UniProtKB/Swiss-Prot annotation:
GO biological process: lipid A biosynthetic process
Role according to the record: Catalyzes the hydrolysis of UDP-3-O-myristoyl-N-acetylglucosamine to form UDP-3-O-myristoylglucosamine and acetate, the committed step in lipid A biosynthesis.
Gene name for this UniProt entry: lpxC
Residues the record marks as active site: 264 (proton donor)
Pathway noted in the entry: Glycolipid biosynthesis; lipid IV(A) biosynthesis; lipid IV(A) from (3R)-3-hydroxytetradecanoyl-[acyl-carrier-protein] and UDP-N-acetyl-alpha-D-glucosamine: step 2/6
Protein name per Swiss-Prot or TrEMBL: UDP-3-O-acyl-N-acetylglucosamine deacetylase
This protein's UniProt keywords: Hydrolase, Lipid A biosynthesis, Lipid biosynthesis, Lipid metabolism, Metal-binding, Zinc
Organism of provenance: Ralstonia pickettii (strain 12J)
Residues where Zn(2+) binds: 78, 237, 241
Classification of source organism: Bacteria, Pseudomonadati, Pseudomonadota, Betaproteobacteria, Burkholderiales
Length: 305
């Protein structure tokens, strides 16, 4: 039986909120089978638990934001992406601010944190959402689509007309049947443009943003002194984001995802459209491990590798 997973022990880290610029303490705790991934604002009295679900995503302008009863947890996509990449089904995420810390702008720190805690199987079957017919969302020239596929693969195209981005490639495809999340996706950093950062700071946002946690571009070049971690790091980060955005559906997807200029909002709209059509998906488990898609086999996890 392909089993659910959680972490073995509590693990904690401290980082900076991308928009607030304030110190954030993040604590990850094991959770029982069937719990899902639950975020808790422990700084509130009483504390507010917000399960990671597609319907709980509210604001998507700058990040994926979970909301409940006036409480918010922002920028959850990188941690959710790491959980998807490591096959974590159940986890308590305690945070003492309204943002998950940005760390280095990728999912690598969260992968390290989860692996440091240890990953263990639980006595319940891992549940998957298998897409059974195409689901598509369009918004102008933007597209996000899910198709039936016995595995998990993603294809993403961006369109940023900038010299530094143009020369790195604007399309990337990955199939986790034969590719490692930790090697090929987890280290891709978020990116932004210097003039946009200044505009955000003028309205009290991006106070924690720096060259230490993002790739920053001016009109002509990359301002960071270090090299890109991947030749096409920009589009790979969009795939990292998409994996995290899609994981709030509640279970790993057995599907092919295709996107053109998609973002957090369109990705969430795609999940809502999927869940609204009961004929578009089914919940499945695998009693025999060898019958599961290769991307999710034990030898490819934790970390799809």
């Amino acid at each position: 039986m392909l089993k659910q997973r959680t972490i073995k022990s509590l693990v904690k880290t401290v980082g900076i909120g991308l928009h607030s610029g304030r110190k954030v303490t993040l604590t990850l705790r094991p959770a029982a089978a069937g719990t899902g991934i639950v975020f808790t604002r422990v700084d509130l009295d009483p504390a507010v638990e917000i399960p990671a679900t597609a319907s709980a995503i509210g604001d998507t302008r700058l990040a994926s934001v979970l909301q409940k009863d006036g409480a918010r947890v922002s920028t959850v996509e990188h941690l959710m992406s790491a959980c998807a990449g490591l096959g974590i089904d159940n986890l308590y995420v305690d945070v003492d601010a309204e943002e998950i810390p940005i760390m280095d702008g990728s999912a690598a720190s969260f992968v390290f944190l989860l692996q440091s805690a240890g990953i263990e199987e639980q006595g319940a079957a891992k549940r998957f959402i298998r897409v059974t017919k195409p689901v598509e969302i369009r918004e102008g020239d933007k597209l996000a689509r899910l198709d039936p596929y016995f595995g998990f693969k993603l294809s993403f195209t961006i369109e940023f007309r900038h010299p530094a981005v143009d020369k790195t490639g604007q399309t990337f495809e990955i199939d986790f049947a034969d590719t490692s999340y930790t090697r090929e996706i987890a280290r891709a950093r978020t990116f932004g443009f210097a003039h946009e950062v200044e505009m955000l700071r003028e309205v009290g946002l991006a106070r924690g943003g720096s060259l230490d946690n993002a790739i920053v571009l001016d009109e002509h070049r990359m301002l960071n002194n270090d090299e890109l971690r991947y030749g096409d790091e920009f589009v790979r980060h969009k795939i990292l984001d998409a994996i995290g955005d899609l994981y709030v559906v509640g279970h790993p997807l057995i599907a092919a995802y295709t996107a053109h200029k998609s973002g957090h909002g369109l990705n969430n709209a795609l999940l809502r459209a999927l869940l609204a059509d009961e004929t578009a998906y089914e919940i499945v488990t695998f009693d025999k491990i060898e019958e599961a898609p290769r991307a999710f086999l034990p030898q490819l996890q934790p970390a799809f590798s």
